[in-house]
Amino acid sequence: NKVSALRGGLGTMLLHSNCISDKQCDSCFFSDECLVQRIMYSKFDIKPAYITTGESVGYILECENHKRNFQKGDLLEFDLILFGKSIIHFSQLLQALFSLGQSGLGANKAHFSISDIQNETGKNILCNGNIIMSNYQPHMLQSYVEHRLTEFPYANELSNVSLIFHSPT
């Protein structure tokens, strides 16, 4: 699963470059201030009643590519959507992704480089090796949900949409 490999790889790279406690998170004196904890396990300010375990994830990784084998030069496109307080950690996530490409992704340690980064409107954030922060434009969660609803096949036929969250049993 590419999303799991990317998530695990990002976490590993963030720990590698930011952890001062030998990756012993449970006993770390600095866990409340830890960048890795803030990005990978972003805490709710107010925890909704339907959340029964764990904390929020401060981002979503989406990958529609179901290809299992990649050759040199093949592209893997994915969306990394940051939420809440994770939005300000874009640079750290980008550095972790760059480091992951250098060290390799997955069981075969496939090396990669970042060829393009775009915002949701298609404007380049990465241009000729430079980051254009003015094109990094945070939006409200509502706009993400509304955009995803337009991708739902029956969205135009519905006047009211309800999301029901089920916690694991």
Task: Give residue ranges: language-model regions.
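RNA-interacting cores
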Residues: 1-169
